[in-house]
A protein has these predicted regions:
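Enzymes that bind and transform nitrogen-containing heteroaromatic metabolites
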Residues: 1-144
Length: 144
């Protein structure tokens, strides 16, 4: 899990209770996880978040071969722009939400040049599935 400020000490304890192994990646030296003692908790501290390095550590130190990312637009953008995604799985809800301050699927800095566009992966639709209550699931392969 990547977190700097959202998890509480209670939340960390809960996650360690329900997890076989729990790995936290943070750049916050005052993160509440540092106060929790749990044999199955591991903390990867980075001065500044480096996703590629964090993924390498997860693989080399903990044997992690595959991860699922369920995050907000800022981290989504970081993973996409660093070309760290193989697949994108999106579930669309039957509601329209918006506004100037509303987070989107991909947040972060605006793309303003052709070089910025090259940082993105092109998506190839692999499947489209209608779910209950008018939800739609789209699965894409990221083409590099």
């Amino acid at each position: 899990m990547i977190d700097n400020s959202h998890l509480t000490e209670h939340g960390i304890k809960y996650l360690t209770m329900i997890s076989k192994q729990f790995v936290l990646i943070t750049s916050n030296l005052k993160h509440p996880a540092f106060r929790v003692k749990a044999d199955n908790m591991h903390i990867i501290y980075q001065d500044k978040l480096n996703l590629r390095n964090a993924l390498t550590q997860l693989k080399c130190q903990y044997g992690c071969e595959r991860i699922t990312i369920q995050t907000g637009g800022t981290l989504n953008a970081m993973f996409l722009r660093e070309k760290l995604l193989d697949y994108v799985d999106v579930v669309i809800a039957p509601v329209l939400i918006g506004g100037k301050e509303t987070s989107t699927l991909i947040d972060g800095e605006s793309l303003t040049t052709m070089d910025d566009l090259k940082k993105l992966g092109v998506l190839q639709l692999e499947s489209c599935e209608t779910l209950k209550h008018s939800y739609i699931r789209l699965r894409y392969k990221v083409i590099r």
